[in-house]
Amino acid sequence: FFSRLYGVPDPEERASELIDRMGLGVSQHQLTRGYSSGMKQRLKIARALLHEPQLVLLDEPYAGLDQHGCRLLTVLLKRLRTEGRTVLLITHNLREGLEVSARVVVMNHGQIVHCAPREEIEVDSFDKLYFRLVEN
């Protein structure tokens, strides 16, 4: 359905590629109501990427994923970055964000309190910033 909606050329091949990338190949013929919450989350991400958007907005995509799902998502996000796609990742987990991001923006109550390229960020000082924001 979504491939027709987006006009995806060769939709079966594209869907199969994303299903494999997200580690859902074994269960692709299973009804989604039998999927775990992590599998459903990975399926939603695959569906969002079906039409190869240039901008991808992901709000807490690691939520509900097991360690394997997190690893698959991290690999996928890094690949999207190397393909030149823009990914806006919203997360409360600094380490996840740092691993896949080129630039990190920290917001507090709708205001930007820190913005820097990933290479300039020291995790320890960032952890201190996070706890200072949480306390306030």
Predicted regions and their residues:
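A short, surface-exposed alpha-helical micro-motif characterized by mixed small hydrophobic
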Residues: 97-99
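Catalytic Walker B motif of ABC-type/P-loop ATPase nucleotide-binding domains
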Residues: 56-59
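Conserved ABC ATPase "signature" region
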Residues: 1-27
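Helix N-cap at the start of a conserved alpha-helix in ABC-type nucleotide-binding domains
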Residues: 67-69
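Conserved catalytic motifs of ABC-family nucleotide-binding domains
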Residues: 52
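H-loop/switch region of ABC-family ATPase nucleotide-binding domains
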Residues: 91-92
